[in-house]
């Protein structure tokens, strides 16, 4: 199997786009994943630009198709699909999957297809399961006890959950911190952690206990679906830790005499936002 042609992402993107083109080619009796319409061409151009921009933001430099690994795409989709409706997420995943199948049909090497053939089906299943569950209150009662129980089920799941809860961060950001602790940890602080929209978090203090756990972790990182399944044992989702953390830290600040307005602004910055309204949203979902 071959790689995409071109010495830059832009040239490889164009090569991928042209390989998929099949305008005017009849589909009767065929079952391919090529581009037969202008509408599909527009979507695939968007997919390719989205993932190319993500790879650039991560300073990845290999051939575009070689970067289509399970690890890279898992991180890309976690960032790209966040806060989209379940139907939009599902359509995006199905469209992207079809595009990769089309490239493989044109003899382009796609690592993901050798690593995990059910990658897209598993992700869509998770989205559908979550969509079927209407979550009003995102607060986790006894969050620390839940985290303790997660450690007993699978140590790495407990570590990811504790990292999310103590630092008020998203699942994708916790995965990155667990994966590369030396890149971000510096004498009791987390620095340069990048969140949604490529925005860096303000420097965060981290407990000595959690810092040592991250630095000394020997467990292999799991994928999102495994973490999801572990959390399902407690009927919670990964983002619930961020909601719960925001509520707990807000109440702690109020107890310490900080005004409500200032506490909300501080929590918003903890969440990597800059608006009081963001904290209001988190508090409304954790009553």
Predicted feature descriptions by range:
Residues 23-124:
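N-terminal core-binding DNA-recognition domain of tyrosine recombinases/integrases
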Residues 1-38:
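N-terminal DNA-binding module of tyrosine recombinases/phage integrases
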Residues 140-169:
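Basic, Lys/Arg- and aromatic-enriched nucleic-acid-binding interface segment
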Residues 108-145, 194-196:
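Flexible interdomain linker/hinge and immediately adjacent N-terminus
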Residues 269-287:
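Catalytic-site neighborhood detector that most strongly recognizes the C-terminal catalytic loop/helix
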Residues 162-187:
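Short, charged phosphate-coordinating catalytic segments
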Residues 195-238:
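C-terminal catalytic core of Y-nucleophile DNA break-rejoin enzymes
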Residues 231-255, 260-269, 273:
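Short basic/aromatic active-site micro-motif
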């Amino acid at each position: 199997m071959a790689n995409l042609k071109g010495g830059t992402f832009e040239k490889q993107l164009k090569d991928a786009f042209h390989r998929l083109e099949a305008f005017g080619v009849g589909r009767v009796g065929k079952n391919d994943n090529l581009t037969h319409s202008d509408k599909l061409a527009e979507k695939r151009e968007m997919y390719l630009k989205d993932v190319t921009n993500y790879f650039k933001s991560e300073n990845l430099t290999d051939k575009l198709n070689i970067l289509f690994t399970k690890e890279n795409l898992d991180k890309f989709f976690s960032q790209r699909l966040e806060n989209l409706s379940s139907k939009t997420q599902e359509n995006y995943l199905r469209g992207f999957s079809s595009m990769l199948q089309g490239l493989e049909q044109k003899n382009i090497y796609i690592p993901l297809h050798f690593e995990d053939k059910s990658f897209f089906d598993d992700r869509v299943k998770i989205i559908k399961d979550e969509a079927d569950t209407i979550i009003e209150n995102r607060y986790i009662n006894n969050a620390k006890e839940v985290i303790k129980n997660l450690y007993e089920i699978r140590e790495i799941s407990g570590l990811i959950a504790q990292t999310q809860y103590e630092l008020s961060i998203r699942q994708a950001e916790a995965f990155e911190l667990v994966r590369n602790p030396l890149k971000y940890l510096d004498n009791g602080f987390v620095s340069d952690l990048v969140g949604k929209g490529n925005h860096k978090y303000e420097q965060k203090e981290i407990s000595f206990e959690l810092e040592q756990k991250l630095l000394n972790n020997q467990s292999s990182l799991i994928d999102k679906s495994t973490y999801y399944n572990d959390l399902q044992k407690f009927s919670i989702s990964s983002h619930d830790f961020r909601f719960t953390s925001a509520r707990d830290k807000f109440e702690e600040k109020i107890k310490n005499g900080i005004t409500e307005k200032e506490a909300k602004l501080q929590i918003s910055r903890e969440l990597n936002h800059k608006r009081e309204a963001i904290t209001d949203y988190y508090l409304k979902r954790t009553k």
